[in-house]
Swiss-Prot record:
Gene expressing this chain: clpB2
Signal sequence, start to end: none
Protein name stated in the entry: Chaperone protein ClpB 2
One Gene Ontology term, aspect cellular component: cytoplasm
Originating organism: Streptomyces avermitilis (strain ATCC 31267 / DSM 46492 / JCM 5070 / NBRC 14893 / NCIMB 12804 / NRRL 8165 / MA-4680)
Stretches that traverse the bilayer: none
GO molecular function, one term: ATP binding
Predominant place of localization: cytoplasm
Amino acid sequence: MDMNRLTQKSQEALQEAQTAAGRMGHTEVDGEHLLLALLDQEDGLIPRLLQQAGTEPKELRAAVREELSHRPKATGPGAAPGQVFVTQRLARLLDAAEREAKRLKDEYVSVEHLLLALAEESSSTAAGLLLKQAGITRDSFLSALTQVRGNQRVTSANPEVAYEALEKYGRDLVLEARSGRLDPVIGRDAEIRRVTQILSRKTKNNPVLIGDPGVGKTAIVEGLAQRIVRGDVPEGLRDKTVFALDMGSLVAGAKYRGEFEERLKAVLSEVKAAEGRILLFVDELHTVVGAGAAEGAMDAGNMLKPMLARGELHMIGATTLDEYRKHIEKDAALERRFQQVLVDEPSVEDTISILRGLRERLEVFHGVKIQDTALVSAATLSHRYITDRFLPDKAIDLVDEACARLRTEIDSMPAELDEITRRVTRLEIEEAALSKESDPASKTRLEELRRELADLRGEADAKHAQWEAERQAIRRVQELRQELEQVRHEAEEAERAYDLNRAAELRYGRLQDLERRLAAEEEQLAAKQGENRLLREVVTEEEIAEIVAAWTGIPVARLQEGEREKLLRLDEILRERVIGQDEAVKLVTDAIIRARSGIRDPRRPIGSFIFLGPTGVGKTELAKTLARTLFDSEENMVRLDMSEYQERHTVSRLMGAPPGYVGYEEGGQLTEAVRRKPYSVVLFDEIEKAHTDVFNTLLQILDDGRITDAQGRTVDFRNTVIIMTSNIGSEHLLDGATAEGEIKPDARALVMGELRGHFRPEFLNRVDDIVLFKPLGERQIERIVELQFDELRQRLAERRITVELTDAGREVIAHQGYDPVYGARPLRRYISHEVETLVGRALLRGDVQDGATVRVDAEHGELVVTYDQPEDVKGAWAA
C-alpha cells in the first residue's frame, strides 16, 4: 500500500500503534494496537464517531487494553527492544481500508476507513469481537459517519478540518439561549427589529452592527437568539439558528498554505448545505478583511463575497465605527453587501434598566445581594466619571467588580478575626520565650500573658464560629438562588414545549416553595448577623463609589466624617501655610466646598483662578498647599512652566504632536498628566509668558471641562482645580498697598486694566475668579520665618537635634532677609546661608552631636547661633 495515500491522522495512528506495541513489550504490531491508537488520538474523529453510534469510547479503550495485556511479552537477553514487526493481518487490514476508501469515492485513506476495516473483521479476531460487543457494525458506523461528515469526500491529507466545522469554529447561540447560558437582553427593541427586517429581505440580507465598544452590539445578536427560542420573530426566522463564528480559532494553527481557506470553505459549505437555516454571526467583522491573506492567497473577505451576493449566506457582522471606516469601507464590494445598523450608547435610564435585568444573574454568580441604589449609582457615576468608556459596559463592570470585592471578603478571613489571630501568634511567641526565664518579673509577666492569651483564644474561637455560621448561611442563600434560577429556566422550557402540567407544577409548586425558603434563610441570616456582623453580603452605593475611586483616583464616595471636618476647616489649614493672603484662600476654599458638596456645575472644572501678584507672595505655595491638603501629596499637582511654551510650535506639546510628527505616540504633557491624575491641581505658572495659541486651548478646558488630545481621546478636566499665576501689574500692587497691606482701589483698577490689555475678553470671561495677592508686610514675614524653621526642624529631627529660634533672631532674619520687590523668596536664601551652612559645618566637625540643641538668637543686630550638647558642652560663634 502507498503510505502517501494515508491521511495525516492515519499515519499518526499507525506510528502510535507501533510505539504502543514496543511499550507493551510485544514484537508484533497488530489490529488491536491500531484500534487502541485510534481510540487514544487527541481530538480524534473515531471517539466522536463512536459516541455518535451510541458507544462509550472509554469502555472500549479499557477492553482493548485488557485484551493486549494478556498477550505474550518478549523479555530477557534475546529480546530486541524497539524492533517491532507488522503482522500479515495488519497488512490485510490496510488493504481493506484502501478498498473502503475507493468504495466511498475518497482520495485518501482516513481513520474512518481503518475502523471500517476493523469492524468488517470476523468475531474470531479480538478487535472484531470487541467492536461487535460494543454494538459497532459496518452499518451503524456508516450511519454515524454520514451524520458527522455529511456528503463530503476525503480530498486532502487533513480532512477532519472540514467535519463539523461550525461546531469546531463557532458557538450555537440559539442552543445557549435555550439552555439559559446567555444573560438576559433588556431594551434594544428598535435595533433587534431592524436586524430582523434586514434578515427577512430577499437580497443583501446581511446586517452589520456598528457602534462604540461596550454599547451592546453582541448583546443584540444574543437578544435575537433568545427571541428565536421564544418564537418572538417573523415566520421566516422561526426555524433559524445563529452561529457565532470565532475567527481566532479559524486562523489558529493553520500552518500550511491553503489550510485556513480549507477551514473557511468547510464552514461555508455547511452553511450552504443548511439552505438558509443558519445565520452566521461574525463579531469583530473587520478581522475578516485580510484574514488568511498571504502572498498569492485569497483573504476571507473575498471568499465570502460571492455567497453574500447570491444570498446563500446570511451573515450578521459587528464592528466599531473606527474599524468599519478603516477596513470595511475601503472594500466597497464587501461594504455594499451589508446593511448598516447603528447602535448608539444607551442613556443612563436605559442602563439602569439593563442593570436591573442582569441583577439576578450577578447575585446568583457572586452569592451576594445588590441594592437598587447601587445599580442607579453605578450608571450615574460611571457616566459622570469614566469618560473614556461607554455605557452599559462600564456600569456592568462596576457592579461586577463591586460584587467580586464583597465575595472576596466573604471567602477571606475578616479583618477583626485576622487581627486577633495575629495577636495570639505574637503572644504565643512571647510565652515560649518567657517560659525559659526564671526571674520573678518574667514569671509575673508570664502569668499575665497566659490570662490574656486565654481571653484572646476564647474571643478568637467565638469570632471564628460566628464567621463560619455567617459563611454557611450566605452559602445556603446562594444555593437557593441558583436552584431558583434553574427552576425558572425549567418552567420556561416547559411552557415553550406546551407541557402545561409540568409548567404549573414548577411555577406554583417548587418555585413558590423555594421563594419562601429563600426569604426565611435571608431573615435568618440577618438575625444571625445582627449589629456585630463580620461579613457584608449586600452591595450598596458605597461599594460602587469605592470602585470608581479605585479606577479613576477621584474621591466620589460619600463624605466621611473626617473629610467633612477637613473641608470645613480647609481655609484654616491653607492659612497655616499661606501667610497674609486671606482673600485668595477664601475664594479657593469656597470653590472646593461647592464641588465636594455636589452643587457646582458638573460640566466645568472645580474652579479656575488667575493669581496676580508680585513674586514671592505665595501664589505657587497656595497651589502646592491645596494639592497637599486635598490629595495628601504634592505629586497630585500638574505643574506647567509656561515660559517653555513661548513659541508657536511648542503649543502642540500640551495636547500631543499631530499624526506624522515625532512624539505622536507619547501624547501631550498636559493631557497625559490629567488622564492619569484626573483629580488634581493644574498649575500654569507665569501664564503671561505663554504664546497666544495656548489661550485658545484653555478656552475649551475652562468652559466645557474637557479637551480632545492629538490621538482623538477626550480628556476630562471637570475634577481639576485650574490655577494660572502671573506677575502682570505687580508694580502697581507694590506701589498701591496701604500700610496695613490692603490694596488701594485705584491700584486694583490699574492691575485689571493691564490684565485686560494682555488677555482677550473671552479668556478672562471664562475664569471663575481673578485673585490679587497682596505684598507681604514684616509681621507676615516673621510668620514665614517660623514656617521655614519648621522645615529645618523636620530635617534635623532624624538626628534628634532641636532648633530654637528666639524673638530677636526672628526679627533679625525677617529684617535682613525681606525685600518687598522679591517677596519671601530671599528668606530661604538668607536662612540657608546664615544658619544652615553654619550648622552643617558644625555637624561635619563633630561640634554638634545627636540630641543637641541649636539656638538661633541675635546680639547687637547680628545673628548668633549657639548650641547645647547633651553633656552640657557649649560653644558659640558669631554669624
